Swiss-Prot record:
<keyword id="KW-0689">Ribosomal protein</keyword>
<protein>
    <recommendedName>
        <fullName>Small ribosomal subunit protein bS21</fullName>
    </recommendedName>
</protein>
<dbReference type="Pfam" id="PF01165">
    <property type="entry name" value="Ribosomal_S21"/>
</dbReference>
<dbReference type="InterPro" id="IPR038380">
    <property type="entry name" value="Ribosomal_bS21_sf"/>
</dbReference>
<keyword id="KW-0687">Ribonucleoprotein</keyword>
<dbReference type="GO" id="GO:0005840">
    <property type="term" value="C:ribosome"/>
</dbReference>
<dbReference type="GO" id="GO:0003735">
    <property type="term" value="F:structural constituent of ribosome"/>
</dbReference>
<comment type="similarity">
    <text>Belongs to the bacterial ribosomal protein bS21 family.</text>
</comment>
<feature type="compositionally biased region" description="Basic residues">
    <location>
        <begin position="48"/>
        <end position="57"/>
    </location>
</feature>
<feature type="region of interest" description="Disordered">
    <location>
        <begin position="45"/>
        <end position="65"/>
    </location>
</feature>
<dbReference type="InterPro" id="IPR001911">
    <property type="entry name" value="Ribosomal_bS21"/>
</dbReference>
<dbReference type="GO" id="GO:0006412">
    <property type="term" value="P:translation"/>
</dbReference>
<dbReference type="GO" id="GO:1990904">
    <property type="term" value="C:ribonucleoprotein complex"/>
</dbReference>
Length: 65
């Protein structure tokens, strides 16, 4: 769990900004979305391969440009 202590003379906005940064770096939201519903292993593998292919294609296009 992500927690942030408010420092002396620190505004709420700064504290919230620090919390948001820690929250994003911890990957809490990403993990929550990933576990929101069940994905069959076969479908998960298919999606991973598809993402990998797309990433490789983009990298190849950048190298050729």
């Amino acid at each position: 769990m992500v927690s942030v202590q408010i420092n002396d003379n620190e505004s709420i906005d700064k504290m919230l900004k620090r919390f948001k940064k820690k929250y994003e770096r911890a990957g809490v939201l990403k993990e929550f979305r990933k576990k929101a519903y069940f994905v069959k292993p076969s479908v998960d593998g298919r999606l991973k391969r598809s993402r990998s292919r797309r990433r490789a294609q983009r990298a190849n296009e950048e190298r050729n440009s």
